Amino acid sequence: SVGATENILTAAVLANGVTVIDNAAREPEIVDLCNMLVDMGADISGIGTDRLTISGVEQNQLHSTDHEVVNDRVQAATYISAVAVTRGDVFIRGARAGHMEMLINRFSEMGVGITPQQDGIHVSCQGRLRAIDFATLP
């Protein structure tokens, strides 16, 4: 779970010794959190994999950093859905197409136009949506 991985990860940064998280969540939000913590002085390896290894550091080893939090994929998906059902035309600033490839592919199959741009995605839907088959995974 994303929340469980975030909680263990943040606690492990200041814990004594080494903490290993097996089956860690690999969502973009976890990668983003890891990168921010490393920028702050944390010792984390395996970023982007399902096995994170965190070597605890002393609190005085951590420092501030400038960081822009990755945009919320669920919120972007909600906006895409709203555009689809209202046949709208919207630019979602900050949305990262690379974090939503499967979702974008499915909406495109349904007839929603989604164009990745440097600072977000352009979403438009003018016609009637097409039905598609899909399956969810754990």
Which residues does each PLM region occupy?
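Short, structured segments at the rim of ligand-binding sites
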Residues: 1-138
